[in-house]
Amino acid sequence: MMTFIPVFLFAAQKPVTEAAQGTFSGDYVIYRDYSWKAPTWIGFLYYNDETYGAFIHTQTPEKTSTVSILFSGKIEKGQLVLTGQQIISSITPDDTFGVNYLMSLLPKLYELKTLPRAGKAPFGTATVRKQMEEFGGAAALDFQSFIPLFHLKTITGANKETALELIEIGSINGNGESVFYGYSPAEPKQDENTFSFDKTAKKETINVSGISLHLDSQWTKIADNSFLCGNTAFLTVSTVNLPPAESGNQLSASERLIRLLTASSPYVKTLLPYTIAEGTPSAFTLTQSVYDIESKKISKDIKRCIKNKDGSFTIISLTVNSYAYSAAQAYFNGLF
C-alpha cells in the first residue's frame, strides 16, 4: 500500500515565483510517456520553487507499479538544480531506472518550458524544436499557455510519432495529494446509445440570460437555467465571475477560465488529448471528453464561453452521452 507524506502544508510556505506564468502551489500535470515499452504515465506536482513531487506509473502483464518521489532543488539562472530526493512510496530495484529518468527529465522540462502568448486565440500556442535523446534526438515540443508547470502539451520524437502527451491537469488544493500520487489511467467501460431522436418533437426557443436555446419537447426544464433530456443530456446556462488575477500572473481571463474548465478532480477526469478550444478570448467554444470515475463512462462536454462587459463569462454548458452525441451530433450542436 502506498504511503503519502503530507508535504503540502509546509511546502506552500516556501518561495513561489511560478505565478507569473500561471502555475500555483498544488498544480500538477500528468503525461502518457510513449518512450517506454510498457504503458507508462509520469506526473509532476509543483509545491514551490524548492519542492516538486513526481511519480512514474507503469503497467505490465506481471504487475502495475507506481513510484512516487519528492525532489528538492533551487533555481539558478533560470534552471532547476536538484539538490535532493525522497522516495515516498514502496520501491524495488527494478524501479531505480524510473527514478533516475524522472530526476533527469524534470530539470530538462523546466529549462525548456515556454509560455506562449494568446493573441487573438483563446490561449497561446508555440512549437519549439530541441535535441532530446530521451525521445530519439530531434524533437518538436508543443506548448499551450493554460497548461501549468512547463506549459507542455506534447513532444513529438524524431520518428514523427508522439513521445509524450498531456493526459490530465489539476490541483491537489481541496482534492488531497492522493488525486496526484494515487493516479490511475481512465478505463472506460463499454456504453451504448439510448437516445432516440424524435423528428416530430415540438420545437421551442427559450431565452436564458440573453442566450437562445433551441430545444424541443424531448427536454424537461428542471430550473430557470437548466434542462434535462432524459438520461442522455444536461444543458445549463450560468455566469462565472473569475477571481482577480494574482499579482504578476500573465495569463489572460480566457486562459485562466480554460485552466479551470479543463482541470480534473477526484470524481471526473478531463481527457485532454481530445480537448479542442476554438474562437477568440472573448467568445470561444471548449469541446471535451470527460470520464466519470465512478461509472467509468465518457461524456461529451461542450461549453460556449462568452465574456461580458463586466468581465464575467456567460457559459452555456452541454453534457451528453458520448455515444448519443456521435449518433446525433448535428442535433446537439444546434441547441445553442
Predicted features by range, described:
Residues I87-E111, D224-F313:
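Conserved polar/disulfide-associated segments of primarily extracytoplasmic proteins
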Residues F10-I30, Y181-F234, V268, K296-I298, ...:
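N-terminal targeting sequences that direct proteins away from the cytosol to non-cytosolic compartments
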Residues M1-F8:
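Bacterial N-terminal signal peptides
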Residues A12, I30-A38, Y101-L109, Q131-F135, ...:
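Short, solvent-exposed secondary-structure boundary motifs
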Residues A138-D142, P148, K153-K160, S282-F336:
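Short, well-structured beta-strand
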Residues I30, Y34, Y46-N48, H57-Q59, ...:
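Polar, glycosylation-prone regions of secreted, cell-surface, and some intracellular proteins
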